[in-house]
C-alpha cells in the first residue's frame, strides 16, 4: 500500500511540476556514425525553417547562401557563410564547438550571448544534410531552426519533401518553412 501511495504521489508531482516533454522528434539525435571529414566543404543553405519571429518577418527577403565548412583547431567546425544582404555580399563566420556525440555541437551567439545546440541529424555527404538547432532567446522563448544544406544550388523535389517532413517533425509549421531562392551574386562557384 505504501508503494502504491508513493507511486501516486510521484505521478501527482510530475503533473504539478510539468511532466518532462519529449522532443518533437529527436532534437539531439545525430547522423549515425557521423563522419566530420565527409561533412567538410561547400554547402548551400537551400531550406530554412524556424519559429523565430525575426525569421518569420525576414524570410521573404532571404536568399540561398554558400557555406564552407572547415575543421576548427578545437575539433569543431568553422562555418564561413557568404550571402546577399541589401544588394551587398556579406560573410559571417560561425564556430561550432563539439558537444558530446560526433555531429552534435554548440554555438554561442555573439549578438545575443545565447547558446544553441546544433546537430547534424541526417547527411549523405554528397547531396544533402539536415541540421537542427535549438536554444533560448530569453525567458520562455525557445528557438528552433531546421536547415537543409545541399551540395548543389538546385534542389530535387524529394529533398524539399524530406525537409518539409523533417521540419514538421521538429514542431515547426508550414508557414515556418522557406526554400531559399538563388541570388544573382555572392554564391557563384
From Swiss-Prot:
It catalyses: prostaglandin H2 = prostaglandin D2. Residues 1-24 form the signal peptide. It is found in: Rough endoplasmic reticulum; Nucleus membrane; Golgi apparatus; Cytoplasm, Perinuclear region. The modification Pyrrolidone carboxylic acid is found at residue 25. It comes from the Eukaryota. Belongs to the calycin superfamily. Lipocalin family. Catalyzes the conversion of PGH2 to PGD2, a prostaglandin involved in smooth muscle contraction/relaxation and a potent inhibitor of platelet aggregation. Involved in a variety of CNS functions, such as sedation, NREM sleep and PGE2-induced allodynia, and may have an anti-apoptotic role in oligodendrocytes. Binds small non-substrate lipophilic molecules, including biliverdin, bilirubin, retinal, retinoic acid and thyroid hormone, and may act as a scavenger for harmful hydrophobic molecules and as a secretory retinoid and thyroid hormone transporter. This is Prostaglandin-H2 D-isomerase. The lineage of its organism: Eukaryota, Metazoa, Chordata, Craniata, Vertebrata.
Amino acid at each position: 500500500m505504501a508503494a502504491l501511495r508513493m507511486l501516486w504521489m510521484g505521478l501527482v508531482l510530475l503533473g504539478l511540476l510539468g511532466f518532462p516533454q519529449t522532443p518533437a522528434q529527436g532534437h539531439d539525435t545525430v547522423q549515425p556514425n557521423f563522419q566530420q571529414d565527409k561533412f567538410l566543404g561547400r554547402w548551400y543553405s537551400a531550406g530554412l525553417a524556424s519559429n523565430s519571429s525575426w525569421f518569420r518577418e525576414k524570410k521573404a527577403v532571404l536568399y540561398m547562401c554558400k557555406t564552407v565548412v572547415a575543421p576548427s583547431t578545437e575539433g569543431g567546425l568553422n562555418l564561413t557563410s557568404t550571402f546577399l544582404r541589401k544588394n551587398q555580399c556579406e560573410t559571417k563566420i560561425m564556430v561550432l564547438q563539439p558537444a558530446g556525440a560526433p555531429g552534435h555541437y554548440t554555438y554561442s551567439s555573439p549578438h545575443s550571448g545565447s547558446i544553441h545546440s546544433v546537430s547534424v541529424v541526417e547527411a549523405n555527404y554528397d547531396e544533402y544534410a539536415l541540421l537542427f538547432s535549438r536554444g533560448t532567446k530569453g525567458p520562455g522563448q525557445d528557438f528552433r531552426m531546421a536547415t537543409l544544406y545541399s551540395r548543389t544550388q538546385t534542389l530535387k523535389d524529394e529533398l524539399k519533401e524530406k525537409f518539409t517532413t523533417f521540419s514538421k517533425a521538429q514542431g515547426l509549421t508550414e508557414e515556418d518553412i522557406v526554400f531559399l531562392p538563388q541570388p544573382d551574386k555572392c554564391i557563384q562557384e
